Regions:
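Catalytic beta/alpha-barrel core
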Residues: 24-27, 32, 56-59, 79-91, ...
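Short, acidic/polar
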Residues: 2-15, 64-74, 117, 193-200
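Glycine-rich, proline-tolerant flexible connector loops at the mouths of alpha/beta enzymes
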Residues: 19-42
Length: 287
C-alpha cells in the first residue's frame, strides 16, 4: 500500500463511522529508526480521523525495537493505542505491561486458551486488558464455530472486550502477507457477504469490536457494515412463492425474541401466540 491509499481509505471509513484500525509490526524488516518514523506518521494521520490503532507484536518485535515489558516508550513515541501480543512475553512481563505508565492497552490473543484470569489475580490491570482473535489467510485454516465459541466464552466470562475479523470479498485484497483468500477469524465466514459475517459474530453475543482483516474493502462493503443493526440479531428473508400477507404481518409486526428451548436448527418466537388472527394460514404440502 501507499500513504496516499491508506489516507483515502481512512477518510472513507471514518465517514461511515468506523473507529478502530489494526496494523502489524510482525513482518516489518526496517531499522528501528525507520519503523518509528513511518508508524508515527501513520498514527498521526489515523488519530486525525478519530481512529484508535492497535499494532500486532510478539517478543521478536519488542527485541527489534528495543522495548521491554517495563519500558515501552518506543510504542508511546509512535502513538500506539493498543499493543496486541500475538505471542505473549511471559506471565510476569505481561502483568508489568498492563501497568505501563502510558495508558497503552494490552490486547491478548483470543485464539488461544490463556489463563488471563490468573494474571488478573496476580496483579494484572484488568481495565487495561482486552483480547482479539487471529485472522487466517488460507482456506480451511480459520477457526471452526466450535473453537471460536469455546475461546470467546472463555474470555467473555472475564469481562474483557473482544475483537474479531471479517473479510472483504473484493478481488486482490491483501493483509500483512501477499495472500488473496481473505482474512476472517471464522472459516465459515470466508465466503459470506461482509454484512452477514458481522451479523454472525454479533449473533454470538460474544464480540464487541469487528474489524476487516484485509484491504481495501469497497465503499459498498463499508456501507453494508455500517448499516448492520448491532442491537439485535437480524436476518435477511427469502419468501416462499406462496407466502401470505398474514405470514408477512407475523414476521414484521413484532419484535421477536427466541425461546430458551429453541433447537440447533432454527430460532423460535412465541410472541405471535399472544395475538388473535381472524385469518388462518393455509396448510402447505410437504416436499
Amino acid at each position: 500500500s501507499t500513504p496516499e491509499a491508506d489516507d483515502a481509505y481512512m477518510a472513507l471509513a471514518s465517514n461511515y463511522g468506523f473507529s478502530r484500525i489494526f496494523t502489524c509490526l510482525l513482518s516489518v524488516d526496517k531499522s528501528p529508526e525507520e519503523t518509528v518514523a513511518e508508524f508515527s506518521q501513520f498514527m498521526d494521520r489515523a488519530h486525525g480521523y478519530g481512529f484508535t490503532v492497535a499494532v500486532d507484536t510478539n517478543p521478536r518485535v519488542f527485541q527489534h525495537l528495543g522495548a521491554t515489558a517495563t519500558d515501552i516508550s518506543v510504542f508511546a513515541k509512535m502513538g500506539v493505542d493498543i499493543i496486541r501480543l500475538d505471542g505473549h512475553l511471559g506471565d510476569r512481563q505481561d502483568i508489568a505491561l498492563t501497568r505501563n505508565p502510558y495508558g497503552i492497552a494490552v490486547e491478548f490473543n483470543a485464539s488461544q486458551m490463556l489463563s488471563l484470569d490468573l494474571l488478573i489475580e496476580r496483579g494484572a490491570y484488568r481495565r487495561n486488558m482486552c483480547v482479539c482473535h487471529n485472522f487466517y489467510p488460507q482456506r480451511f485454516s480459520g477457526l471452526s464455530e466450535k473453537r471460536f465459541i469455546e475461546f470467546s466464552e472463555h474470555y467473555f466470562g472475564m469481562g474483557l472486550t473482544q475483537a474479531a475479523f471479517v473479510t472483504s470479498q473484493q478481488n486482490n485484497t491483501f493483509g500483512p502477507w501477499p495472500v488473496y483468500d481473505g482474512l476472517p477469524t471464522c472459516e465459515d465466514d470466508r465466503t459470506r457477504s461482509i454484512d452477514l459475517q458481522a451479523r454472525h459474530l454479533l449473533a454470538t453475543g460474544l464480540i464487541d469490536d469487528i474489524m476487516i482483516g484485509n484491504c481495501f474493502a469497497s465503499e459498498e462493503e463499508l456501507a453494508a457494515l455500517a448499516a448492520v443493526d448491532t442491537t439485535k440479531v437480524t436476518f435477511k428473508v427469502e419468501f416462499d412463492s406462496g407466502v401470505t400477507e398474514v405470514e408477512k404481518n407475523v414476521l414484521y409486526q413484532f419484535n421477536h425474541v427466541t425461546r430458551g428451548d429453541a433447537s440447533e436448527y432454527y430460532l423460535r418466537s412465541s410472541v405471535p401466540r399472544m395475538f388473535e388472527y381472524s385469518t388462518s394460514i393455509p396448510a402447505r404440502e410437504r416436499t
